Amino acid sequence: MDAPKKIGFDLNQIAEAFSLERVHNQPELAEWLSAHYELNTMETELFESIYTELQEDGDYWNEEELKIQFIGLAFRIAGTTVKNRIKVFYERPLSAQVNGYELAVISDCLVATPRPFHAPRNPYFFLQEFKKKRGDKKDPEAQMLTAMLIAQELNQDGLPLYGGFLFGSNWQFATLVGRKYCNSRQFDATNRDDLLQIIFVLRRLKELILNRVAQL
């Protein structure tokens, strides 16, 4: 039996190895990005605090500071967590054999149904963040896409997977439906309207995952 092949975090290599098609429109992504909510008073105060810090210090944060000062608080405002049903995890390893390839990645952040002792069971959303430029060996989009392919293999439910990747303050969201991959425009977290929409998109994850779990 042949040993599984290795593949790096390279978008073109990944696309060719797994016959992925990049599409420019996908209903699942459009519906997700259209999310709209109202923030309560406490959420608004935290939102304003994050927005101010991004304006003042965001360009100088390292990856860990970005995670602590921004990403974790964004999920808190979004209210994504549901006790015993949905949790946000950080720095979790994922691996699987997919189509003869050994895939492995450490997910900077993922949203999943939880196991009893705070471990992810079924992952549905992945967020990769990086401070350097595209093309680096740690390209966050390639890492996110690798995590999505692993999740398809682990979940075995044929349902869409959701993701996001950051270059500094610029966010993009993505969906993988079967072998069709689509990503969004950039959302600049230093822009108030874009930051608010990032929060809404993260909040919408809760509904998407709860609906999905109800189907299982």
What function would you assign to each model-found segment?
Residues P116-N122, Q156-G158:
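Short, solvent-exposed loop/turn segments that connect beta-strands within catalytic domains
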Residues I86-H118:
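Active-site metal-binding core of divalent-cation-utilizing nuclease and nuclease-like domains
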